[in-house]
Amino acid sequence: MRLAGRVVCISGGGSGLGRAIVTRFVAEGARVAVLEKSPEKAADLVRELGTDVELLVGDATSPHAAQSLVELCVKRFGHLDVAIGNVGVWDFGTSIDELPERELLEAAFHEVFTLNVATHLYLAQASKGHVRNANGAIIFTASSAGMHPGGGGPLYTASKHALVGLVRQLAYELAPHVRVNAVAPGGMRTDLRGPSALGLHTRAVNETPLAGIYSRVSPMGVLPDASQYVDWYVALASATEATTMTGAVIEADGGERIRGRAASEAARASAIAESSVGPPSGCIGGG
C-alpha cells in the first residue's frame, strides 16, 4: 500500500473528488481526518470507511474549523503527515457581462475567493507545524482554469490563478521540510455547486451537459470520474514518491490545453447548441 502509516487531514471530503480521495487513501493504508459541512455526508463516510476515518462537521470558511480539524487529527491518530485543501465552488462560467453589480458582485467575489483560496490558506496555516515535523506535504485542488482561460468565468478563473500563486509562495516559504503542490483537474462528474451570491448554490455540475461538451473539448474524448484524478494525490502524499516536487501544479486536464482555443470554443458551442440546458457562458468547468 502506497500510503501505509500516513496520517492525512482533508477539508471538503464528503462528496465528489474529496470523497474519492478519502476512499482511495484509506484503501492505500492512510488514516484520514475529514472536515465536512454536511452532517449527512459525514455520517455516510463513517458508515462506509469505519475507524480509519475521523469526521469533523464544520464550515471550512472559518479558520477555527481548520485548526479544529488539525487538532482532532493529531489527537486521534498521533501526528499529521499530509494536509489536503479540497474545498471549492464553481461559477458555472458566469461571464463579466452576466455578473451582478455593486453589493451582489462584492458578495460573489468574497464568497468565491473565500472558498477557493482562503480555505486553503487557513488549512496550511493550521497544519504547517505538524506537517513540517513530519517532513510531509500540503496538497491543494487547483483547476485547469488556473492555468488558462475558458474553464470558468472571471471570478472562478481569478480565484484559481490566486490558488496557484499560493501554492508556489508556500512551497518557497516552507521548504525544505514541507512539499507544497497542487493538482489541476479538468472537468469531471461531480456535484460541485455554485456560489449562493450568484443564485447557483442549488445547481450542481452534474446537472449541466458537461459530458457532451467535455468529450468534444478534451483530446481524450471522455469526461472522467473524480476517482480517475486521485492517483496524483496519492503520489504527492506518499513518503517515497514525488519527493523532488514542490511548488508544482500537475495539469491533469485530459489535454484541454493542447486542444487550442479556437477548436475548444467551436466544440463547446456545438455541444451547447444541441442541449436545452447549458452553463451560462458555455464554460466546461474544472476541479
Protein language model regions, located:
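C-terminal substrate-recognition "lid" of short-chain dehydrogenase/reductases
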Residues: 2, 121, 130, 222-251, ...
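Conserved mid-core segment of classical short-chain dehydrogenase/reductases
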Residues: 67, 89-110, 152-155, 265
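Short, small/polar-rich loop/turn modules that mediate ligand/substrate recognition or access, typified
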Residues: 135, 175-179, 241-246
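Catalytic Tyr-X3-Lys loop
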Residues: 100-121, 139, 156, 163
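Conserved glycine-rich cofactor-binding loop
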Residues: 7, 12-15
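Residue(s) in the substrate-gating loop at a strand-loop-helix junction
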Residues: 143
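Active-site helix of classical SDR
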Residues: 124, 159, 167
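Short C-terminal tail/terminal secondary-structure segment
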Residues: 90-96, 240-287
